[in-house]
Structure formats: structure tokens, C-alpha cells
Amino acid sequence: MINALGLLEVDGMVAAVDAADAMLKAANVRLLSHQVLDPGRLTLVVEGDLAACRAALDAGSAAAQRTGRVISRKEIGRPEEDTQWLIGGFARATTPTEKAPQVPATPEFAEALLALLASVRQGMTAGEVAAHFGWPLEQARNVLEQLFSDGALRKRSSRYRIKN
């Protein structure tokens, strides 16, 4: 589950790169995606907690104003699952209401994931795990939930950590 989303629509590639750089430097957010809407018009999507998304959008808007034009910006706290699907891209074969089949936590997935989580003190969200391994979000969520139910992980909010 994504904690919060920040969307920033700008005119110009230079403004978009400048805004993305400023957003990532200003707050603890992750660039989830970007969309080129028209030639020269781009939308940047960041993920993080709500305060971080707001700070990132403030910094990104200021940077984009210096080199281009800001069309619009929006923060979305605790987005609905269908909204997450919409932001994640339309290329998924499943519809947002369908559940992906459970993917068992195979030993090689589990070992690699546990090693990664051991190196990240604050834990990781399913979205961060999916981005790191190049997995679909549902697969990452299923593997994390399987390890959580097996007692290997603890969960606080949307973050998974190694159980001490």
C-alpha cells in the first residue's frame, strides 16, 4: 500500500528533470513514474509519506517555475487501490478488481528479500521491494505477506522489517 502520492505536471523536459531532481533531494520520496503527455508536457509521480510528498512538490514546483512552467500539482494521502493501479500504469493484464494469484515465497526470493531487508534499517514497503527486484506490486506484496505470516518479518503500517 502506498502511503501518499505526489503528482507534478510541468511544461518542458528541462523543467521536469529539474523538478524531479529537486523533489528527490528535498524529501524522502521515491520517483514512482513519469508520463509524457504531449510533446513537452510531463507528469512526475513521487511516493512517500504525506509530509514528504508535500515538501517534495513544493521544491519541485519552485524548481520547475525557474526553468519552465508548472501546470498543476496534487498530493493524495493513502490512495485507494484502484488509484494506485492507475498510477502504476495501464499495462497490467489484470483489472484493478482482480486479485493476482498467490505467489509462494520460494527460497531464492525469500533469501534475497530477507538479505535486502536486513540491510535497510527502516524497512521497506511493497512498492519499494517491487521496484528493487523488478517484480509486479502484487508479487512483492504476496511474498512479503507470506514471510510476515511465517514469522520472519514484522510489519508496521506499510513497512516490513526483519523480526528481531
UniProtKB/Swiss-Prot annotation:
Q: In which pathway does it act?
A: Amine and polyamine degradation; ethanolamine degradation
**Pfam families cross-referenced by the UniProt entry:** BMC, EutK_C
Can you give the residue ranges of the BMC domain?
4-88
Give a yes or no for keyword Transcription regulation in this entry. no
Assign the protein's first listed, main location to one coarse class.
other
In a knockout, what does one observe?
A: Not required for aerobic growth on ethanolamine (EA) supplemented with cobalamin (vitamin B12). A double eutL-eutK strain grows as well as wild-type on EA and cyanocobalamin, but a quadruple eutL-eutK eutM-eutN strain does not grow. A non-polar deletion mutant grows on EA at pH 5.5 to pH 7.0 but not at pH 8.0 or pH 8.5, releases increased amounts of acetaldehyde on EA plus vitamin B12. Preventing acetaldehyde vapor loss allow growth up to pH 8.5.
Q: How is it used?
A: Artificial BMCs can be made in E.coli by expressing eutK, eutL, eutM, eutN, eutS (eutSMNLK) or eutS alone. Cargo proteins can be targeted to them and beta-galactosidase (lacZ) was active within the BMC, showing the BMC allows passage of substrate into the interior. This can lead to the development of tailored BMCs for specific metabolic reactions. The addition of eutQ to the eutSMNLK construct results in biogenesis of multiple BMCs.
Keywords (alphabetical) are: Bacterial microcompartment, Virulence
Q: GO:BP terms for this protein?
A: ethanolamine catabolic process; generation of precursor metabolites and energy
Q: What else is known?
A: The need for a bacterial microcompartment in EA metabolism can be bypassed by increasing the levels of EAL and an acetaldehyde dehydrogenase (not necessarily EutE).
Q: Which family does it belong to?
A: Belongs to the bacterial microcompartments protein family.
The protein depicted here goes by the name: Bacterial microcompartment shell protein EutK
